[in-house]
A protein has these predicted regions:
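Local beta-strand N-terminus motif with an aromatic residue
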Residues: 64, 127, 280-281, 429-430
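General small-molecule cofactor/ligand-binding pocket signal
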Residues: 107, 224, 265-269, 303, ...
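Short phosphate-binding/catalytic loops that engage adenosine nucleotides
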Residues: 28, 64, 103, 221, ...
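N-terminal Rossmann-like dinucleotide/flavin-binding domain of flavoprotein oxidoreductases
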Residues: 234-280, 370-403, 413
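Flavin-dependent oxidoreductase catalytic cores
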Residues: 1-203, 207, 211-218, 223, ...
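Flanking helices and flexible, charged tails adjoining ferredoxin-like Fe-S electron-transfer domains
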Residues: 186-195, 218, 222, 230-231, ...
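Rossmann-like dinucleotide/flavin-binding elements
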Residues: 197-225, 267-275, 279, 286-296, ...
Length: 505
């Protein structure tokens, strides 16, 4: 702009200062005004922290009562929405810089999750207040639990942006949360007690299975989880090997704690079959997804992604030593086949180890079903960058992405690919990793054939994401006994939801 609202900082501040002046004119000089603005905008030529500090001084002089320091602009979706890649409190530095320059209170925001961390940055003088948004969607009783000293009961936001953004605001529908079924669905607040307590078998201790067990037990059913592996968690356990997904541990810790506190019977290293399950009133089948094995020559030379993403840490709580298997060995130049989390997470994890990665997908678009903000940051990192405002470990060798392409033949040291124009290409690779998945419904089909009362939940029903699996489990647990649904208008016996009442005791 070249008018009085553009160019110099004073001109660019004119609009907001005139708004502040008019508010005070209408509401009185003592009417408190808070201004929220970004510490840095994270685009070429955009505002940096030095100018942000000067703006803070101008706003204080204009009579503003408090400053709330955010991050980013619309064209910088990473720092604006801060998905899983961004560490807790990453934006606190901006509030700290502003606080040193003004005497009015300063608030910080962006990926603040734990009360202990919030107390720490306030005590260190980096901020006066903390601002929470997504965390209060994941657990609206965050402050109550913190005040009561029940921080271990807080359902910590994992920054996935699936429920609150991709499947709500982005498509202009009511708010949802990937890890809290009660958000936007009041049926889950005060749960309708079971009309008849049922013996419920839940096959699979992943997201869907654990959430189903939690809700069903709260309603009064007797649940048993059958898990073939040596620990609960399912696909969540791969968070150990994929650094950007480390926040998944927060949800896994919370849901496993709920299962333990509720007294759900858990049978680890146990494979369920029709004979074992006949004694139960109902079966919820959450057996997850299985790796797609393309029928091409040499496929036996490939390895599955779940055999690569195996934790090697000693005494890892998610991968007990008893029964822990060794990860598959991979070479330096690796082809990863697939286009959902199994493939993209594997590609990122091994690229961070310095491997040269080629990601091959039959789709015409990269990762079409992955949450868009994560996808944008992932693409920046795959291209050899580190994402806007991100610090730490970048991918040193860019990940190649081949669209509209499938496997044709695998040989020792090379792979032949074929694209949608039937053009073939042979490339040198040391290892092929299969990362495409599909529902593993074999047990479900056998239970249906045997005439058992069964529901299919999670990835064994349809491969989706955390919210898809969690919602499946919660919904199934709500209708176990003759499809009873709660009437949100007649459950007013307590202001706290059923699970929060238990947690706060």
């Amino acid at each position: 702009r070249n008018d009085r609202f553009g160019g110099s900082l004073q001109n660019r501040m004119r609009f907001v200062l005139e708004i502040i002046d008019r508010i005070k004119m209408k509401c009185g000089p003592d009417f408190p005004i808070m201004v929220r603005y970004s510490g840095e905008e994270w685009m070429p030529g955009s505002r940096k922290i030095d100018e942000t500090v000067e703006i803070a001084k101008m706003l204080e002089a204009a009579g503003v009562a408090m400053l709330d320091i955010s991050a980013g602009i619309f064209d910088a979706p990473g720092p604006t929405m801060d998905p899983m890649y961004y560490q807790e409190g990453w934006n606190t530095y901006a509030a700290e810089a502003v606080k040193k320059a003004v005497k009015i209170p300063v608030c910080t925001s962006h990926t603040l999750r734990h009360p202990e961390y919030c107390d720490k940055i306030i005590a260190e003088g980096k901020t006066d207040l903390v601002g929470l948004s997504r965390q209060l969607i994941a657990d609206p009783y965050w402050a109550d639990k913190a005040k009561a000293g029940k921080t271990e009961e807080i359902r910590t936001c994992i920054s996935c942006l699936v429920g609150c953004w991709k499947e709500s605001l982005m498509i202009k529908r009511e708010m949802r949360c990937a890890i809290n079924p009660a958000i936007g669905d009041e049926r889950f607040l005060n749960l309708q007690p079971a009309r008849k307590s049922l013996k419920v078998a839940i096959v699979g201790g992943g997201i869907a299975g654990m959430e189903a067990a939690r809700i069903a037990t709260l309603r009064g059913h007797k649940c048993t989880i059958f898990e073939k592996d040596n620990e609960l968690g399912g696909i969540l356990r791969t968070c150990c090997m994929v650094p950007p997904k480390s926040k998944m541990k927060w949800y896994m810790d919370w849901i496993r704690r709920q299962i333990k506190e509720l007294g759900v019977e858990v049978k680890l290293r146990t494979t369920a079959d029709v004979d074992k399950l006949k004694e139960y009133d109902v079966v919820l089948c959450g057996t997850g997804a299985k790796t797609v094995i393309p029928q091409v020559p040499g496929i036996e030379k490939a390895v599955r992604f779940e055999d690569v993403l195996v934790c090697t840490k000693k005494n890892c709580e998610y991968w007990p030593e008893d029964g822990k298997r060794e990860p598959a060995k991979i070479g330096q130049r690796v082809l990863v086949y697939g286009n959902h989390y199994g493939a993209t997470d594997t590609a990122e994890a091994i690229a961070l180890r310095g491997k040269e990665v080629i990601l091959v997908t039959e789709d015409s678009e990269f990762a079409p079903d992955i949450e868009p903000i994560h996808k944008e940051v992932m693409k920046m990192r795959f291209a050899g960058g580190n994402g806007q405002a991100l610090e730490g470990n970048p991918i040193k060798i860019p990940v190649q992405i081949k669209l509209n392409t499938s496997l044709y033949e695998i040989k020792d040291g090379e792979v032949t690919l074929i694209n949608n124009r039937f053009e073939k290409e042979t490339i040198k690779v040391d290892t092929v990793i299969l990362g495409k998945t599909e529902p593993d419904s074999e047990l479900y089909d056998s239970l249906i054939a045997a005439g058992l009362k069964v529901a299919n939940i999670g990835d064994s029903k349809m491969v989706r994401n955390v919210r898809g699996a969690m919602t499946d489990g919660a919904e199934a647990a709500l209708i176990l006994d003759d499809d009873i649904f709660m009437n949100a208008n007649n459950m007013l016996s307590c202001a706290l939801p059923t699970d929060v009442k238990r947690q706060m005791k």
